[in-house]
Amino acid sequence: MTASTQNGSPTPPPAAPTATNQESKNMTANPADASESQSPANEKGSGTAESGQKHTSTAANAKDPLRPRRKKAKRACFACQRAHLTCGDERPCQRCIKRGLQDACHDGVRKKAKYLHDAPNEALMPGIRRNFYNQANATRTNANQQQNGPNSNSNKDSRQNVAANFYSPQSASNFDVYTQAKSQQGQGHIPPTVMQDTSINPSAFQAPSPTSTPNFDLSSNPPNRNLSSAMTQTPSSASNQTQDPFGAAFFDPSHPALFNFDIASMNFGNRYGALEFGMLGHMATGAGDTPPSDSATQRGSIGRSSGTFTAQNFGDSTNTQSPFLFGDPVLNDWNPSGQSQTNPRNNNIYNQNTVAGQMGEQHPNAFAIESAPMNFASPGSTESPQMTTMNQFDEANAKFSSRTALMHQTNPHQPPPISTPGLKHQGFQVGVKRRYRSPSSIYESVKEPYSYTSGFHNLTAFIQRRFSPQKTLQIAKALASIRPSFIATTKTLNQDDLIFMEKCFQRTLWEYEDFINACGTPTIVCRRTGEIAAVGKEFSILTGWKKEVLLGKEPNLNVNTGGSSPRGSGTFTPRNGNGVDPHSGMSAAGGGGGRTQPVFLAELLDDDSVIEFYEDFAKLAFGDSRGSVMTTCKLLKYKTKEDSAALFQGKEAQQGGSDGKGGGGGGDVAATAATTSTSTSNGANSSGHANANRNNTNPKNSSPPSSSSAAAAGPLHGAQLSPKQTWGKRGIAGEAGMNQLGFRDGKVECSYCWTVKRDVFDIPMLIVMNFLPCI
């Protein structure tokens, strides 16, 4: 409303509409300047011609390229944020002063990201001169608001104090966390403010993990000191320190000893994003406070927090050092608790000043995952229910101490604790965690390439001896389909490439050895020719094939081919009835006269399974490099000629004994002879066979043995002594139950999954197979 309108004049001055039109045109070019110039005119009611000329000159100056540009503020005020106008860094801003809103000018609240939903608004404010959000002050402010209400005078003062601590440069903490902790480390001193407020600084109740070592060494504190005394006593040398080492400044971003990154150099709108980015890099690089001597923690392993971990374990090798630092956690529990009491330095560094060693020695052990001070955690996490008073610790410790004392009184003859040196005298052998063999030995030992040509020739000869012409033709077609691919990939390889190929195979096999030993699944690894290169003990238990026989270190005397006689006859008659070794063609009765070489995969499967395997191998060898095949098969049990003869003698004797008189004793004697020959040829457990022989040689004992004795004696013996006995699938357990699988027809029905791993030349290098019996 113009001045002429207020005075009652019927027509406005001619300059007023001109200025209004000019102002409306300039608002599109610079809405901020137009609104700022228009607001005083509307409030004061100035409508003179001089006012219109002033607006015209201001609009003209807005287009001046030499006019200084206004910088954008880091955070706009609430009024400017709602009006989408440019604000300033000062509070109150100039626009709010012009509009008379200087009392209500405060920073606007931005929309939080999803990962910041639990962060308070103060934490998202940008820091000025290394002054970041103070969790201690914020917690006290929230407590005051809950007690006095949001509009009380005390809360207004607290909010002003928080803002002053946040923005004032004088509130920056000059406390050097790293050097102060290092200087107090040898003296056993604790910064006073760490112990003053346990609810604000719960870092005292945090157990550090192997990924970050503590900043304070409390090894000089006695381990049996109560929590109350440990928290109330503060050293006199640190009484003049009033700053909180972790509270006033969130952390010192310029100090390389904490996180090795500078938050000020990162272009983030808030410190949460910078902290997340910096901590990810800190965790990925492994560059923390962990000493270089602790190689186990640098690998990111999770150690177990127990009372035997001492401060001297990290780099100090004295006689009082725990011998099992990151070994078996069971061995850590066997260390005597008195050892840490006699040595003042042998305190639990993972318990720090919480209970002075009591929690680590008396209470159950726990796994420490991460234990940076709680000030570095999300502010929302400190508000969760936790033990914030020392009365809870005192009560728990008192109950546990009384219970422990009662146990000692009721059991005066309690054996002494087992010490680690005592374990050595008792002959306790600690398992080797890592092999002594180095991968470098593989590159030094391999001098010649592996002859795959002779391996394929031996495979072809074995297939022709064992399978019928029709089945041999099916296998030959499958191998012929991938023969051109083998020729194309190997024709450009020279001698050095072939040697390198064998080194790659041995190096990969070296990695699979740990996998096979750690995995409880029957597993074998073979070359592309089908020759067995590695085998697990579970596979030997399942099939009866010894590892030395499969790897070619002992002669292969197996005569069980599983397909020469009609299906279901239950016989072990081989195709070569004279017991010829399928590898060398020599007689197997000679007891090891044949040539030793690795067993082919085709010798472990029945006829149908072998044909199916090579058909799938032809599709997967040069097909999907990450593909796998999952199907069923039948594994052949390891049976020698003596085993087959003993089985036939036992069955004939039992059949004759059932027809004539007194046949029971003859059957028992024949079964005893069969048992003796079988145990000699297989080299099985001598104690179990001896027990079976003693039971069978008694003429009075003509009744069939129980299922447990038959399982202990082996599957072959159970078949001889009780041919009509059936094994329940639920009764299979342990090694004895695995041995009795396939005792009838010499075949173990399994489900197996296998895949092909290629080398650097994209040639099939090895085949990894996992078996599970169908029970």
UniProtKB/Swiss-Prot annotation:
User: Where are the compositionally biased (Gly residues) regions?
Assistant: 657-668
Keywords assigned by UniProt, alphabetized: Activator, DNA-binding, Gluconeogenesis, Metal-binding, Nucleus, Transcription, Transcription regulation, Zinc
Q: Where does the source fall among the domains of life? A: Eukaryota
Keyword Disulfide bond assigned: no
Cellular component GO terms, alphabetical: nucleus
Subcellular location field: Nucleus
Point to the regions of Low complexity compositional bias.
218-229, 669-713
What positions does the DNA-binding region cover? 77-105
Q: Which biological process annotations from GO are given for this protein?
A: cellular response to starvation; gluconeogenesis
Protein role:
Transcription factor which regulates nonfermentable carbon utilization. Activator of gluconeogenetic genes.
Task: Tell me its family.
Answer: Belongs to the ERT1/acuK family.
Q: What is the name of the protein in this document? A: Transcription activator of gluconeogenesis HCBG_00867
